[in-house]
UniProtKB/Swiss-Prot annotation:
Subunit structure: Homodimer.
Name assigned to this protein: Nucleoid-associated protein Pmen_2646
Single GO molecular function: DNA binding
The species this protein was found in: Ectopseudomonas mendocina (strain ymp) (Pseudomonas mendocina)
Record carries keyword Oxidoreductase: no
NCBIfam families reported for this sequence: DNA_YbaB_EbfC
Family, similarity comment: Belongs to the YbaB/EbfC family.
Biological role: Binds to DNA and alters its conformation. May be involved in regulation of gene expression, nucleoid organization and DNA protection.
Record keywords, A-Z: Cytoplasm, DNA-binding
Length: 108
């Protein structure tokens, strides 16, 4: 009985590891869009935190450099927050059925 239980646990652990690997790949390839200035600046970022694209509204071309820098920084920060939120939501959904002890932190 103990031997079968251990084999079952090992199989579950392997399946979980495979699911985690697939989830991490999906998260890394996911794209989010952060915005600032009511959409005047947008930043597209991957789950790896790679910035793919920055879009500036034409009306901003008349603004001074400092305003543009602030808006770009705010849009990047918004994208980073969205990447983190997306990761947390996906991982929470994956671990929802697991019997984990209170306060247990997954190693990812």
């Amino acid at each position: 009985m103990m031997k079968g239980g251990m084999a079952g646990l090992m199989k579950q652990a392997q399946q979980m590891q495979e699911k985690m690997q697939k989830m991490q790949e999906e998260l890394a390839n996911a794209e989010v869009t952060g915005q600032s200035g009511a959409g005047l600046v947008s930043v597209v970022m991957t789950g790896r935190h790679d910035v793919k694209r920055i879009t500036l509204d034409d009306s901003l071309m008349q603004e001074d450099k400092e305003v543009l820098e602030d808006l770009i920084a705010a849009a990047v920060n918004d994208a980073v927050r969205k990447v983190e939120q997306n990761s947390q939501e996906k991982m929470a959904g994956m671990t929802a059925g697991m019997q984990l002890p209170p306060g247990f932190k997954m190693p990812f």
